Each structure stands twice: as C-alpha cells, then as structure tokens.
Amino acid sequence: ELFTQEQFHFIAEEVSSDGGLDKEIDKVGLSTLERSFRALIYANLLSADANQQSIFYQELNAGIRNVLLNQGLHYLSKEKDTTGFSSQYGWVHAFAHGSDLLTEVVCHPDFPKNRVHEVFDILGQLFKRIAIRFTDDEDWRLARVIYEPILQGKLEQEQVASWIKTVDFPIEE
C-alpha cells in the first residue's frame, strides 16, 4: 500500500468536498480533465474500500462512501465532453475514467443489487445521447460496467439479456 490510512482519509475527504464530479459539469477543457481524473481517484478509493485484502477495506467514512457511490453512479449521465486525447492536456478520457468508476460502483458491496436497473438506464441513455463513436478504448471500459459485475455475482446474464431486448439502440451502417 502506497498510502497511510491517514492519507487515504485525507484524499477521500478532499476529493469529495468541493462539489466532486458535479463541479463545473457544464464546462469543458481543463474542467473536464479535473473531473475525469477525480473519477479515477473515486474509482481507486472505492476499489480499496471494497477489497478485503486491502488495509483500506471498509475504511471510507459512510457519508463519503455514499457520495462516491452516488456521484459515481450518475457521472456518465451528466458528462458531455467526449475528448479522448487532447494535444493541450494529454489524455482527458472522461468517458473511459467514468466507466472505470461506474464499474467500481456496481461491484462495490454497498451498492445494492436492486439498483442495477439504474446502471442499465444510464448506459442506455448514454448510448442514445452520445453521437460520436468512441475510439480511445472507451468501448471496452464501458463493457466492463456489465461484465465485471457478472463475474463478481452482482449481475445475472439474464438481466443483461432482458435489458438489451428492451433498449432501442440507434445503429448506424
């Protein structure tokens, strides 16, 4: 572990204290870069909090954990900046990092199985709302939102099949 428990708590408090992933959600560029990497920090905090082999297992304050879970669940439904790589900033990757975060949210032991339908709603809306084709590895990271919870027993394949049957995805030839 590269952090002490004190540092872990400090990072969790700081990253969630000023609006979190909702901060400047309507702005792009540097604001997106900050949100994107904040999403990665959220994902790592939740991963450590959920990992029974980690010294940080269940170490997040319950209030902060709930903020991370709730903001992580809804982040991709709010993010608009689809920049993958920027010549000015490097990798911005908000949708890839947001997908990594959503995967950690769904797989976290404190995320109830009966809320999986919200994840399906968010993904369905995302596929309808985003007009571009992702080309910077966002696709497989979005796929992880579905297959990691299946592998961890948080989601049944039948649930995914039922959801796919109900969604009218726009398909381009």
What residue spans do the PLM features occupy?
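N-terminal carbohydrate-binding/catalytic regions of secreted carbohydrate-active enzymes
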Residues: 1-6, 10
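Eukaryote-skewed repeat-based solenoidal scaffolds used as protein-protein interaction platforms
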Residues: 11-161
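CBM-like carbohydrate-recognition segments
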Residues: 155-173
